[in-house]
Amino acid sequence: ERSFTLRGIILGGEEPGIIYHALGVNGASTRSWLACPRLEEDLSLVTPDLVVFSIGINDAHDPNFSAERYERNYDALIGKVRKVNPDAAVLLVTNSDSYRKRRYPVRNAEAVRRTMLRLAEKHGCGVWDLYGVMGGQGSIRRWKRQGLARPDLVHFTRDGYTLIGDLMFTAIM
């Protein structure tokens, strides 16, 4: 049996502007990103000027969460980016507030956020503090009441994601 795997297509022209690559996968964690065998190879093909990491909430939801392991994994991910693209700017977006089973605040959310802030300082990365922008622990409930978060108290609605994008764009610009 013959197989074919398409890992991506890059189409472009000579016009200046922004080229956007998204490598998001629902449920991804630092551990799953480190398990990607071609991450460095793929990053070397696109040579980004800016890499935005917005991962952490899935790590925080892990019942076997370890702050030390999370920090080691995230540190290794940043290291992979720096190895392949030492001149790329790196922006860390902190985790959002969320709940487990719609009832229990994710107790590791603050530890994940603190780890990101430490790593940003260590590696000279920018930080956009989504957790703080949302309002901290419990804020996802307010976002849900305003139609910005889904009933699972983890994910956002289209309006919520749009607002997050607008707020992040405003902060960067």
Language-model segments: residues:
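Conserved SGNH/GDSL esterase-like catalytic core that processes O-acyl groups on lipids
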Residues: E1-A76
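Short, functional N-terminal and low-complexity linear motifs
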Residues: T5-G8, E40-P48, K83-D87, D129-Q137
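Residue-level recognition of the N-termini of beta-strands and the immediately preceding loop/turn
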Residues: I18, A88-V90
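Generic preference for flexible, low-structure residues
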Residues: V25, L34-E41, N64-A67, V90, ...
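Conserved N-terminal glycine/acidic-rich loop preference
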Residues: T47-A60, E68-V84, L91-L130
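Catalytic His-Asp segment of secreted/periplasmic serine-dependent ester chemistry enzymes
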Residues: S96-M173
